[in-house]
Each structure stands twice: as C-alpha cells, then as structure tokens.
Amino acid sequence: AAMAETRPAVRAARWHNYNAIKDTIADAQCDPVQAVADIIAFAIWNAQRVNDPYKLCRIHESGDFFSLTYFLAWIQVAREHPEIKFYAYTKQLEYWLGVHKSGCIPDNFYLTASMGGDEDYLLDQHPEVFKRVAVVVYTEEAATQHGFEIDHDDSHCFGDKPFALLVHNNQRKGSDAAKALAARRRQGSWTGYNK
C-alpha cells in the first residue's frame, strides 16, 4: 500500500490488474479459474518477451489472494509453468489448507503463512501444513528472543520452518512500527527489502 501512495502509476496498474481479474471471474462463461490463469500466464509471457525468462515469481509484492478462484488460478499457472518457482505470503490459510488436503499444490508453488490474520488459529491446528510461517518483528532482538532467523532476501520462503521479517517500508505515522523503523534508520540498520 505504501508504494502505491508514493507511485501513482504503480497504484493505477495494480487497480487495472485487480479489476481485469475480477471482471474475468464475473464474466467467465465456463471455467473462471482457467480464464484468470490465462490472464496471469499471458502477463508472465508478455513480461518475458522484454526481460530474461523468469526463474522465480513472487506473487504480490503486497496484498493477498482475494478469492478462492484467484488462488486456484495461480496454482494452475504454476502447474503450467514448472520451470518457474512461484512463491507468496498469505493470510488466506483456509484456501491453502483446502487445496493442500486435495493434494493439488504443485512442487514449484511455495506458500508462507503470514502471521497476524483472522485464520491464525489454523497454524497450531495444522503444523504439518503450515511449516513456513513469517512473523513481523520490530527489532532483531525480538526475533532472537522468539528463536527466529530473520529473512532479508525471501530465501526462507523455500525452507520448512518459521522465520521473522523485520518491519519495513513505510508505516503509519506515529505507529509503533513506524517508530521502530525510524530507530533502525537512525542507527543505520537495515530498513527494507530490495525488489
């Protein structure tokens, strides 16, 4: 959200994509999952025409899966592109659990549970499913106290244990998160992820 505020073109592109996908879901005559998967796959193909082929694709820089259809479409895209590792952070644990139970998550699709959502109760109920859990902390000391390694480069998204992320990017003015980030900036410490 913070990037969208500082970069209007990014915000406009994200809303365009969101609306295109929602319209496709609403207008799909047969299979909305495949219709959305086709849009996503076309966007990947189009981006690769002018860039190097993707080996890694992070789903959402910010945001989450807004519907089960959208979630399933990404799984379909991963199935169709086994040469690409897809990964995402999500609080949509019920979607993940349902698809996991059906055995339909491909090997190149990595999900990390983002702690702090309404479905966190599922984390303790299904630790065999939710092995990768990300917890946002304000300081390196807090991560150490909880026994978490800090992920600075998304590499922990491919492991099998919980990890911490330091609070980053822009935070609401006056919030504890903003104060923690400002303190790290004053110390010359790490304050953000490279995209």
Language model features with spans:
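Class I S-adenosyl-L-methionine
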Residues: A1-K195
